Swiss-Prot record:
Biased composition, class Basic and acidic residues, residue ranges: 72-86
Cellular component GO terms held in the UniProt record: chromosome; nucleolus; nucleoplasm
Pfam families linked: SURF6 (PF04935)
Protein's UniProt name: Surfeit locus protein 6
Molecular functions (GO terms): DNA binding; molecular condensate scaffold activity; RNA binding
Phosphothreonine modification, residue list: T221
Length: 353
């Protein structure tokens, strides 16, 4: 009976402990909150400056300063270790009354959340504007302006692309309507500056000669051109043949003369200038020979002038060289006279030679 009562008391106590014990995560949060609150509430600790930069010579000479430094370190660490142990024990201790610890844990969580939020804002660069400097604010303003400018540019590009697509669609529909207009405009009554180019091969020499003979009218070559001497000789030869034919057969000579006149008229009708007047040909030949003689005289005069100029420049050059040579010799003589030499030229001038 006593064993059953003991077992029942043991199970009831165990159930109370399990029910009263909080979960693992709140315990950790409570301990962290308590430690942080205690640290925040506690006065700032005075950190002792440790003598870390000691010279190597003193360490080599004596070991006593080392022992003292190690003793000081151990003494300085003892209160810290004791405080840590106290914090750990206080965190591990479960309060008998769980409702009394809840306000402290909630306050610690709020403090932690506030600190975390502040750190996140500082990392993002979105802290309060009062704490930021003017350079940071200017930098933010420039970044914002750059973002706005890029947005506007992207918006303009999208608008241009839409307009181009709309224009292409309109052009695709317009050609069907423009084709009849172009066909109607392509039927004028007269066309100017229309040049038809054929891909014919150039004619050879025999073909050109044949075409030239076909162009002749009455097998009579027209008296055209500016070779007045040749035209005059041809005209005189034609007149001599007519005189010879007139002596033999007057009728045939008249027929040939009429044929020649008619052929000349046909050539003149086509716009060819016929030079069949012997007097005019002789005058033209005289004028041409006169102009040729004038050009010949002008050319000869020009060549003579050029040759004279060249000779004049050559003579001037030679004269300048002689003067330069004489001046050089005179300078040498002057130098010799300054040195006290007696020259034969001076003796001749003095009449002592």
């Amino acid at each position: 009976m006593t064993s059953l009562l003991a077992k029942d008391a043991y199970l009831q106590g165990l159930a109370k402990k399990i029910c009263s014990q909080p979960s693992a995560e709140p315990q950790k949060r409570k301990s962290a909150g308590k430690t942080q609150v205690s640290e925040a509430a506690a006065p700032p600790r005075k950190k002792r400056k440790k003598a870390q930069k000691k010279s190597r010579e003193r360490e080599r000479k004596t070991a006593k300063p080392k022992a003292q430094a190690s003793a000081e370190k151990s003494e300085a660490r003892k209160p810290e270790v004791a405080k840590e142990e106290e914090g750990a024990t206080s965190s591990t201790r479960v309060p008998a009354d769980g409702l009394a610890a809840e306000p402290d844990s909630l306050f610690a969580l709020d403090v932690l959340r506030q600190r975390l939020h502040e750190k996140i804002q500082e990392a993002r660069g979105q802290g309060s504007a009062k704490e930021l400097s003017a350079a940071v604010l200017e930098k933010r303003r420039r970044r914002k302006q750059e973002r706005d400018r890029k947005k506007r540019k992207r918006r303009e590009l999208r608008a241009k692309e839409k307009a181009a697509k709309a224009l292409e669609g309109a052009e695709a529909t317009e050609p069907d309507l423009q084709v009849p207009r172009e066909e109607a405009q392509a039927q004028p009554g007269l066309l100017f500056n229309k040049v038809e180019v054929t891909e014919e091969e150039p004619a050879n020499k025999a073909q050109r000669r044949k075409e030239k003979r076909q162009k002749l009218k009455g097998n009579l070559t027209p008296l055209t051109g500016r070779n007045y001497r040749q035209l005059l000789e041809r005209l005189q030869a034609r007149q001599a043949r007519l005189e010879d034919l007139r002596d033999r057969d007057a009728g045939q000579a008249q027929e040939l003369e009429a044929k020649m006149r008619w052929t000349n008229l046909l050539y003149k009708a086509e716009g060819v200038r016929i030079r069949d007047d012997e007097r005019l040909l002789q005058e033209a030949l005289k004028r041409k020979e006169k102009r040729r003689a004038q050009r010949q005289r002008a050319w000869e005069k020009r060549t003579a002038h050029v040759v004279g100029k060249m000779q004049q420049r050559q003579d001037q050059r030679r004269q300048n060289l002689r003067k330069k040579k004489a001046a050089k010799a005179e300078r040498r003589l002057e130098k010799a006279r300054k040195k006290g030499r007696i020259l034969p030229q001076d003796l001749e001038r003095a009449g002592l030679a």
